[in-house]
Amino acid sequence: MNMKTIEDVFIHLLSDTYSAEKQLTRALAKLARATSNEKLSQAFHAHLEETHGQIERIDQVVESESNLKIKRMKCVAMEGLIEEANEVIESTEKNEVRDAALIAAAQKVEHYEIASYGTLATLAEQLGYRKAAKLLKETLEEEKATDIKLTDLAINNVNKKAENKA
């Protein structure tokens, strides 16, 4: 995509984020199946449901401004993050150590999404897209909350069990 304006940058980032979320919906179910920890599996399933809502919210962002149209593209960053998670699954047994590594992989995804939605919300505000900015901030807060939940699960549950495994 040839970007000449800040709006072009916004559309590119929105399209990239849409692709990232779509890829993530396919990956989260696999992550939930790969874990040995029920709480972690539930967290992955909950984030899958939340991700469906976030995709719908991106659709609402597009509908909120008549000049916005998502471009077909593939988010190579998310593709790489998902590949890392798949490598964790392939290189570990289904136990607490894998669970700890899957949380680390999932948090990389969350941090990427936090960066994406933070930038998108800022650009939407700058472009005067009030409704879009509000929707994007809502998703940003969900991503931050998911990251906090994963950190809590790691510290108070999974990592302790993985440490005792050694």
UniProtKB/Swiss-Prot annotation:
One of its GO terms (molecular function) is protein homodimerization activity. Signal peptide: none annotated. GO terms for biological process: DNA damage response. It comes from the Bacteria. InterPro entries: DUF892_YciF-like, Ferritin-like, Ferritin-like_SF, YciF. SUPFAM superfamilies: Ferritin-like. This is Protein YciF. The lineage of its organism: Bacteria, Pseudomonadati, Pseudomonadota, Gammaproteobacteria, Enterobacterales.
